[in-house]
Amino acid sequence: IEMGLTGNASGLMAPATLAFASDSKMAIPKATTIKFQTGIAEDTLLMASAHRVNWSAAQIDVKIAGASSLDVESEFSDTTAYSVGLGRKFTEKTSGSLSYSWEKGAGATSGSGFTMSNGSKTLSLGLKHQTNNLTLSGGVSYTKVGDVDVSALGGLLTAAYDDNSVTAVGLKASFDF
């Protein structure tokens, strides 16, 4: 994807209108996922996956004409995320899963405003229960995000992302008729 931008920005850093022109380039990365699963015991499934994304060939590059200190460039690195988990059928109506995922970070410092983490580690738990017409399912996932310090736009943008985590919870009820 390649695009060119022109436009006006009013009141960003001063009350005056700022006219700018930009020549921006972006790309969608190539990604490959390999998934594996096998039964390891009756009613127990082992799952694993690897997900590789070639981010280094998909950078974002925004050039602001006449204001090079405001240029924005990404520093995306190729990444590989791994996951391993177990699925278990407890009864004919109830099953659950537990998984652990991790992605190695690219470094604890970055010169790009697009960098907000340095890898991650995730623990997920899911549960499903079925009756005749009703299926209840839910899950919880906790992700610990790696720390990173960012200094971009010639030092105008600095940020320290430390001790961050994400907790996600999902619930679903479905009726069959």
Task: Describe the function of each predicted region.
Residues 1-177:
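Outer-membrane beta-barrel porins/channels
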